[in-house]
Amino acid sequence: MNLFIKIINKYLYKLIYNFIDFYQKIISPILPARCRYYPTCSNYGKQALAWHGVLNGSLLLLKRISRCHPLGGHGVDFVPLPLASYRYQYLSCNPVAHGQFHGFYVYRDNHGYVTRLNHMMKLT
């Protein structure tokens, strides 16, 4: 059952992504610029699909398209990061008092917000 869902998700991802690509390359050059947001709705859709998957990415894209009209908003509206994939750990305010660290150390963040954002930007 899980394999079947993965196959369906992969097929739907390719279908929606190719439709957006078709729109960007064939339909969009014919029409005048219409999108009131940055990034454009089609680029937003590609990022939302890549970052959030088929179901959540499609819902984000539909919400964005429904806002993109003359009475709707305008401006910069980036795709929200998928924060559910982060690992959170509690760090005490005073680690030296607990004997955890002695001396100077460099903290390398492999799972933080900025690291995840940079990684996601490389994927799209």
Swiss-Prot record:
It is found in: Cell inner membrane. It is a peripheral membrane protein. Pfam families: YidD. GO terms for cellular component: plasma membrane. InterPro entries: Membr_insert_effic_factor_YidD. Keywords: Cell inner membrane, Cell membrane, Membrane. SMART domains: Haemolytic. It comes from the Bacteria. Could be involved in insertion of integral membrane proteins into the membrane. Belongs to the UPF0161 family. This is Putative membrane protein insertion efficiency factor.
